[in-house]
A protein has these predicted regions:
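Sensory-domain boundary/capping and coupling elements
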Residues: 7, 126-144
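Sensory modules in modular signal-transduction proteins
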Residues: 3-37, 80, 144
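PAS/LOV-family and closely related PAS-like sensory domains
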Residues: 44, 56-97, 106-108
Length: 144
């Protein structure tokens, strides 16, 4: 039995407040929602079929791709239920702090077709925490 709800999953994914991005087995972007446009500054038309390197800081790319390939080969990731917090890069070059989880998308023949991530921009929170840490360190230095 199908219940008619008026719910449109495609619209939900496009309109979600968090970025939803998917990349194929080579790391090329195959899906980019409106929140991804807002967070990273790239329009969907600018990123489709381009590498995730657009949003990965250069210093972290080697480590990212090693992990990406390991997931592609093993078919397993522990970031599906764990939130990963990492730096990212906006189109204009500014640094972002993002938090995300991933899900593996399998093809009918049980091979990984893509990895999808749900991403939240936590830059403001990160900046606030850094300022608090610096302030606490200053207070400790004065009291030493």
């Amino acid at each position: 039995m199908t219940i008619k709800t008026g719910f449109d999953p495609d619209k939900f994914v496009q309109e979600a407040g968090d970025a939803i991005i998917a990349a194929n087995s080579e790391g090329l972007i195959i899906f980019w929602n409106k929140a991804a446009e807002r967070i990273f500054g790239y329009m969907t038309s600018e990123v489709l079929s381009h590498s995730l390197d657009l949003i990965i800081p250069e210093r972290l790319r080697k480590r990212h791709w090693e992990g990406y390939q390991q997931v592609m080969q093993s078919g397993q990731t522990h970031y599906g239920s764990e939130v990963l917090r990492v730096p990212a890069v906006h189109k204009d070059g500014r640094h972002l702090s993002i938090a995300f989880t991933v899900t593996l998308l399998f093809s009918d023949d049980a091979h990984i077709h893509a990895i999808a991530a749900i991403i939240r921009d936590e830059t403001a929170r990160w900046d606030e925490e850094r300022a608090l840490r610096q302030r606490a360190a200053g207070i400790e230095a004065k009291n030493s």
